[in-house]
Regions:
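A short glycine-rich, Lys/Arg-flanked "PGG" loop and its adjoining helix->strand segment in the class I
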Residues: 55-74
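A short SAM/SAH-binding and catalytic strip from SAM-dependent methyltransferases
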Residues: 38-58
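Class I S-adenosyl-L-methionine
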Residues: 85-153
Length: 153
């Protein structure tokens, strides 16, 4: 198991960008040292609690993602949720209000086009049938410059 982890890390290191940080942690409990360090956060086809957070239906998660961003940093998400997922897509005003409460200005919330979906060729998107069997929504938000990152959050 350790050997396969080393091989996976080596492959990622060869492909990764030198300024990329990879972390396995819950979005709502990210270390405070990460507050404000990111110019951008990308979330591709989340499910479960991360999907609820991106849809502003689990605010601690959305707030955690927002805390990662420096002033004017961008959160970009591609999401797909249908009734059988047990989630309802929020209306524009509800999503906007949730993002504002998390210190983010919602700049885009619309159905993604085929090219945007193709630019995110994840295995999970293929399994979902994203864009083919299920609609995909693009969400883009920008961190408000006047936000403060409280100590320990």
């Amino acid at each position: 198991m350790i050997d396969s982890s080393r091989r996976a890390a080596a492959k990622a290191a060869r492909r990764g960008r030198p300024n990329a940080l990879f972390l396995v942690a819950a979005a709502e409990t990210l270390p405070s040292e990460l507050s404000g360090i990111a110019g951008g956060v990308t979330v591709n086809f989340p499910w479960g609690s991360l999907l609820r957070g991106v849809l502003a239906q689990d605010m601690p998660i959305l707030e955690g993602l927002g805390r990662l961003l420096g002033p004017n940093g961008r959160l970009e998400a591609m999401v797909s949720a249908v009734a059988r997922d047990g989630l309802t897509l929020p209306g524009d005003s509800d999503l906007r209000a949730g993002y504002l409460a998390a210190g983010l200005d919602l700049s885009e919330y619309r159905q993604a086009n085929a090219q945007e979906i193709a630019e995110r060729p994840t295995s999970w998107a293929r399994r979902l049938g994203a864009g083919r069997d299920r609609p995909v929504w693009r969400i883009v938000a920008v961190a408000r410059a006047e936000r403060q990152h409280p100590e320990g959050s």
